[in-house]
Amino acid sequence: MNTLMKIQLVRPVFRITLRNYGKPERFMWCQKEYARAPKVVCLDGNEIPVIGLGTFNSPKGQVTEAVKVAIDAGYRHIDCAYVYQNEDEVGDGVEAKIKEGVVKREDLFITSKLWNTFHRPDLVKSALENTLSSLKLKYLDLYLIHWPMGYKEGCDLFPTDKDGKTLYSPVDYVDTWKAMEKLVEEGLVKSIGVSNFNRRQIERVLEVATIPPVTNQIECHPYLTQKKLIDFCKSKDITITAYSPLGSPNRPWAKAGDPVILEEAKIKEIAAKKKKTPGQILIRYQVQRANIVIPKSVTKDRIESNFQVFDFELTPEEIEIIESFECNGRLVPLLNQYGHPHHPFEKDEY
């Protein structure tokens, strides 16, 4: 699919060009200036706001306020996960804004993820119910299999043996997927998808699915543009959700001397030319690729800034510069999980 799509906004006026996306009607732009993010229409007809608030590695005690600030700033998409251990704070923020009358539940798009210790089909529903309880919600808009790799069932999020090696579950993610489909049938989730799946793993899911995944949430930034995987997913009408779009500079395992995409001189030059921040440039880059993007922040100014990316356009030349940083630079490689039969990156598969 090589559709060239040009979409015109009413206010502020600009044109955005998206290549290799497919059906023009599947990327809808809202007409209200900054009031709402554009939405991607998924293959099941459900709509996902193109910018969401990420909550990975958000400090305890700060998440509730971050969610409230985000909703006030216009965000309607919140991305969370059981393993982040802050879903209760996300729920408090959402509940507060609903009680204030700022939003209704149906205005929001809430995503969470099934953790690796709950891959066994009989555990999937109870895992979701725990998440719903923490979030104080009756349903999720989107539920993802967080990783294709199952871990040993139990209370430990990262179960290990006496030598520190991760203990695996023999469950195949295709069996987990069938249990995910039942959640849709029961009305507990509206859409289901995957995260960190490579091409072959998605193909295996599609082979058994009666409800196909609507999105693949993957690491995506200029050091890792994921062009092959994105093209494959979009050929199957699977949207992309980009995590770590700013290069995850505060990731706990970062080492001194690791490159920081926000500090790259060429990115800063583009930002200065546009009178924008480097972060806004990187978020806009994902938006122009028709990718959903979920930057994380707990800082009010940054949360608001990350949302203000709809009043400018990157030129093809600027996009070429941004993509020149591609180096297969994966920042979330899960090296300590090498050896798992379902590790998505060990064989450098896309």
From Swiss-Prot:
Disrupted gene: phenotype observed: More compact border cell clusters that are delayed in their migration during oogenesis. Integrins fail to localize to the cell surface in border cells. Impaired IMD signaling pathway response in the fat body, but not in the gut, upon Gram-negative bacteria infection. Conditional RNAi-mediated knockdown in oocyte somatic cells slightly delays border cell migration and produces a more compact border cell cluster. Conditional RNAi-mediated knockdown in oocyte germline cells has no effect on border cell migration but results in an elongated border cell cluster.
Binding site for substrate: H146
Residue numbers binding NADP(+): 244-306
Subcellular location: Cytoplasm
Active-site residues from the entry: Y84
Catalysed transformations (reactions): an alditol + NADP(+) = an aldose + NADPH + H(+); all-trans-retinol + NADP(+) = all-trans-retinal + NADPH + H(+); 9-cis-retinol + NADP(+) = 9-cis-retinal + NADPH + H(+); 13-cis-retinol + NADP(+) = 13-cis-retinal + NADPH + H(+)
UniProt keywords, alphabetically: Cytoplasm, NADP, Oxidoreductase
Family label: Belongs to the aldo/keto reductase family.
Protein name as annotated: Aldo-keto reductase 1B
